[in-house]
């Protein structure tokens, strides 16, 4: 008998944020995350100390999934960001950096947690109300008559992921493929409730990125021998399909627990095989041309199908089942019981395809909204990062269909929001404190901490020691290289703002970001030219960024409100 140990008492810590260890750990986490932010973000190599593969990334989903944090405060932060990313796919780094900045800034102030939380909530409501209003000059409506805005959005996502290691030509090629794949998932017939289809990403490593392509329907990898043996003759009316999610190998894997009782001299193998052959006869009688099985098909049943010119493909895997059901219209069959004819589906044709050294069955649908993105890359690491980026871009396009706006990127939304909040608080402080019941001094310091946190996120885009500026007309971010900074004449040094909307030849004045400047009212009228020049802009997903802003502030408030941390050490 193993030695029994007495249970250790739980460890209770008060005011966790007052601990210097927690503060320093939070600062380190912020540094790691902030250094990944933006197109010139630094890559991180993650690997387990006990071995395993090395993962190179700058994306929040991969970074936080592989980053081990132990303190409960950090777990709250990382879990909140991961939950946001699982729902919206984008703006994870933005959310994490803003949350860390808010916590650090509030901790330096002489404010009670209750007051800080109340003021943070008010300042958040100012931001969200403005971003949702028609007066917002950070928000651009999506024109569905053109693909320019969609391409800008996809291009912005691709260029913000340096671990994909794409050239400009490759970025344009992949961006166009992502948009094409997305458009293929939109049904032609619009009903009251539109249901988007699905795009499957198939790997082809060791090939040029520009060899990537999009195909309607579905690719199922197979050997060259299988293709020669199984491809049927074409039929004018299409091919009838049966889709099985249960094993057709004759095993008892689905029998569950218990005892199987068999009569004397009865062969279980022969009995099961006869049942499988009876199923095969039923499929032949029902004029099924193609049998797809998630698991294994018995060799004798395969031979039976082959002799009757029925194509049988097994081991397709669970990941393709949903897509196969959409492509064929078939309902997955989960037993060997008599089959109802309504469970069958159909495809237009099945043909062979070869890409690189791989061979595929290509299922061509009748009208299904399923397509395959054959994604090529030079190595495994770049392919994994590119796959994750393509999935993010697809999801962001879906979100944009639901809420057809984009936000200006390149840090301009953050600096513009900070300028808007500063001006609002400066001119309406008396009315705000009358409603909220705090002093103007507390409101001003809380607003400064909030705006500084937003500006720090924008400043995290600069990784090479350059100067970060804000113009005092639009409140947009401007970046100047370290070796060309010229405080005397910024207009000769600067080119365009972070999002690309404005150029430095306009009559503008600038101030160094995070320096002291008088609050100003940023122009809240978006120029009409912006609507036509969206293809040249850096933009972010409206839905994802708005959610990220809310999650960051709410998580910071939750952490600031922590009084005790109780850990079970057993």
From Swiss-Prot:
GO terms classed as biological process: artery smooth muscle contraction; brain morphogenesis; cartilage development; cerebral cortex development; chaperone-mediated protein complex assembly; cilium assembly; detection of mechanical stimulus involved in sensory perception of sound; face development
Main location: cytoplasm
GO annotations of cellular component type: centrosome; ciliary basal body; cytoplasm; cytosol; kinociliary basal body; motile cilium; nucleus
Pfam families in UniProt: Cpn60_TCP1
Presence of the UniProt keyword ATP-binding in the record: yes
Tissue and organ distribution: Widely expressed in adult and fetal tissues. Expressed in the developing heart, brain retina, limb buds, as well as in the developing neural tube. Expressed in the embryo in the first and second branchial arches. Expressed in parafin embedded tissue sections of brain, kidney, retina, olfactory epithelium and the ependymal layer of ventricles. Detected only in restricted regions of these tissue sections, including the ciliated border of renal tubules, the connecting cilium and the inner and outer nuclear layers of retina, and the ciliated layer of olfactory epithelia.
Residues reported in the UniProt entry to bind ATP: 192-199
Localization, UniProt: Cytoplasm, Cytoskeleton, Microtubule organizing center, Centrosome; Cytoplasm, Cytosol; Nucleus
Gene null: resulting phenotype: Mice demonstrate retinal degeneration, failure of spermatozoa flagella formation, elevated blood pressure, olfactory deficits, and social dominance, but no polydactyly nor vaginal abnormalities. The phenotype closely resembles the phenotype of other mouse models of Bardet-Biedl syndrome (Bbs2 deficient and Bbs4 deficient). Obesity is associated with hyperleptinemia and resistance to the anorectic and weight-reducing effects of leptin.
Keyword annotations of the record: ATP-binding, Chaperone, Cytoplasm, Cytoskeleton, Nucleotide-binding, Nucleus
UniProt function note: Probable molecular chaperone that assists the folding of proteins upon ATP hydrolysis. Plays a role in the assembly of BBSome, a complex involved in ciliogenesis regulating transports vesicles to the cilia. May play a role in protein processing in limb, cardiac and reproductive system development. May play a role in cytokinesis.
Family to which this protein belongs: Belongs to the TCP-1 chaperonin family.
Oligomeric and partner information: Component of a complex composed at least of MKKS, BBS10, BBS12, TCP1, CCT2, CCT3, CCT4, CCT5 and CCT8. Interacts with STUB1. Interacts with BBS2 (via coiled coil domain). Interacts with CCDC28B. Interacts with BBS12. Interacts with SMARCC1, a component of the SWI/SNF complexes; the interaction takes place predominantly in the cytoplasm and may modulate SMARCC1 location. Interacts with DLEC1.
Name of the featured protein: Molecular chaperone MKKS
